[in-house]
Amino acid sequence: MAKTIEFDETARRKLLSGVNKLANAVKVTLGPKGRNVVIDKKFGSPTITKDGVTVAKEIELEDAIENMGAQMVKEVSTKTNDIAGDGTTTATILAQAIINEGLKNVTAGANPMALKHGIDKAVVVAVEEIKKHAIKINSKAEYANVATISANNDPEIGNLIAQAFDKVGKEGVITVDEAKSIETTLDIVEGMQFDRGYVSPYMVTDPEAMIATFNDPFILIYDKKIASMKDLLPVLEKIAQAGRPLVIIAEEVEGEALATIVVNTLRKTIQCVAVKAPGFGDRRKAMLEDIAILTGGQVISEDLGMKLENADVKMLGRAKKVVVDKENTTIIEGAGASKDIQGRVNQIKKQIEDTTSDYDREKLQERLAKLAGGVAVIHVGAATEVEMKEKKARVEDALSATRAAVEEGIVPGGGLTLLRAQDAVKALKLVGDEQTGANIILRALEEPIRMITSNAGLEGSVIVEQARARKGNEGFNALTMVWEDLIKAGVVDPAKVVRSALQNAASIGAMILTTEVTITDKPEPKDASGAGMGGMGGMGGMGGMGGMM
């Protein structure tokens, strides 16, 4: 296919146009007084949202080069969302400011590579400044503040998330679900969740929700593959006689064994679901042992001389309830002795202290959370489906932001932290176009506060100057329209969100500044041949050719 190649100023101007179209659609949502965006859907009702990444994901532009610019900025918001779960609008605004300011300088003759180096150096010191001022959070009120801000100043959502963290701890599992009523509620269930689902969809008990739910089941824990039915048959017969459901957790269930379980489940002879064991290698063995201790069962392991065909009901674990979906298994209220569980928890804590590997520490902390924490479920209720979707998205944002705040702490919100980071950038001593690159970041750092105040109906430049004149955490609260200590007022952002937004914006911004050529597919010409055929009607006169005979 033929390509269209654009160079220099023409290429950059079109990229900039695409960047601005996307960013202008996204930035109206920023701040407590940001506006909604209504997105048309081909099927069903339109989506109403104040979430930057949701808006960005919907945008596709007709012009190929403009669309490339838009897609690159879309990458900023999705990447920030993936890393920190929030801050997508801030990231987009920062990227737009860096690109607009940078391209002015490139057009004026600045060296794009030197600008990039200056931008990179400025971002490093700004990020260090953000980290330096981060405050660790531990209290329920602090969790509530972070979640409330991220949920567009909805204290109901903020308080629910704070309660969830308070109940299951920092490492606990918190999930978001749609409620059957208009009330938004929080349910706490003691239990363990791991990321493995059923091996066959024929095992579900609720075909509509595609989940298998068993009350008071036996749990068979086996560390090898189950392929032959003769190994499994003795246990299945004992379970069938007891008339109780069975959950099988094994390395793999396949072949004859899987076929027999599925057929008997469909015939309602037995209630059974098979799940692949979580983890790999030694970590899998350790996690199976965790499950065994939690449920009061034993890992049937050939390494210890046990055979599956000799397994007894006494070796099986028990739980009040087990819920299995396509991707996750949740064991609720395992029947294990609390002293055994506590002993296992202490053992894992000791391993966390002793390990030198960050990866191992992270995995051990995950195991600890699964064993010690519960499972919190936030049921989101609303009057209409449109409101439900919008509210659920806000709850998920707030949950991600709170997790980010737990990781790296909080900083003053309202764009103040980025503005305060200007001092560190000003202290940089650079020369030539590198200094110009640092100045681009200086200008970009004040853009979020400008936009927040602009969306609140005030002049951004005035608020920026007034904020500079004040010290510490004193900033402008766009919700109450007063100047106050933003930390005390609960106007806070997770440091991780602010940091990620700046880093991702600078990364894509610098890429666009150093772009010299764009190559796109040449649009195919509209097929005109079909339209011209109508004129052939005149060929009817060919009837007169009969006289030639």
Curated annotation (Swiss-Prot):
It is found in: Cytoplasm. Keywords: ATP-binding, Chaperone, Cytoplasm, Isomerase, Nucleotide-binding. PROSITE patterns: CHAPERONINS_CPN60. Its EC number is 5.6.1.7. GO terms for cellular component: cytoplasm. It catalyses: ATP + H2O + a folded polypeptide = ADP + phosphate + an unfolded polypeptide. Pfam families: Cpn60_TCP1 (PF00118). Together with its co-chaperonin GroES, plays an essential role in assisting protein folding. The GroEL-GroES system forms a nano-cage that allows encapsulation of the non-native substrate proteins and provides a physical environment optimized to promote and accelerate protein folding. Belongs to the chaperonin (HSP60) family. This is Chaperonin GroEL. It comes from Leptospira biflexa serovar Patoc (strain Patoc 1 / ATCC 23582 / Paris).
